[in-house]
Regions:
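Short, positionally conserved secondary-structure boundary motifs
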Residues: 1-73, 138, 145-155
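Short coil-to-beta-strand transition motifs
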Residues: 79, 101-106, 137-138
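Structural motif
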Residues: 80-81, 95
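Hydrophobic beta-strand signal
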Residues: 84-85, 98
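Short, compositionally biased
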Residues: 93-107, 111-117
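Glycine- and charge-enriched low-complexity intrinsically disordered segments
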Residues: 112-155
């Protein structure tokens, strides 16, 4: 069974926000930065970047959510990250999704084993959630970006 009817049927709470086309998500852009050897080939600098253009494909269907918890750390999603969720993407196995299971939200990876669908944390010590064990299953959206602060490490 493949879930073709992905839908949302209610308010999500205060942890959700929708970007507007007027929000100031722009800044100075240096075209590239080398993490190895610098490139002398750069002969121009773009004056600005509109983060909406790069991060938001469908503004009407895009939301920001704040992550609480660490079960998705191996996917590069950490506690307090800001996720960009696109509800217009049809979820497939392998996607990180926001799911509503019997009224409770969760962020997990959608996987398929044989004919069953599961939601799985990207940490091994968390059990997979069998979607067939729930009455009300809604895949609310697909996580497309995770924004987090880079912390200083002791060296």
């Amino acid at each position: 069974m493949y879930y073709n009817a992905w839908y949302w049927s209610g308010p999500m709470g205060s942890n959700r926000s929708r970007p507007s086309s007027t929000e100031g998500l722009s800044s100075l852009l240096i075209p590239t930065i080398s993490a190895g050897f610098p490139s002398p080939a750069e002969d121009y600098i773009e004056l600005g970047i509109d983060l909406n253009k790069y991060l938001i494909r469908n503004p009407i269907s895009t939301f920001f959510l704040r992550v609480s918890g660490n079960s998705m750390n191996n996917a590069g999603i950490y506690n307090n990250d800001l996720l960009i969720i696109d509800r217009s993407i049809n979820p497939h196995p392998g996607h990180v999704v926001v799911a509503l299971l019997d009224g409770e939200f969760t962020l997990k990876r959608l996987i398929k084993k044989k004919d069953n669908y599961y939601l799985k944390a990207d940490k091994e010590n968390y059990p997979a959630i069998n979607l067939y064990e729930y009455v009300d299953i809604q895949i609310w959206g697909v996580a497309i970006y995770s924004i987090h602060e880079l912390k200083k490490q002791k060296v």
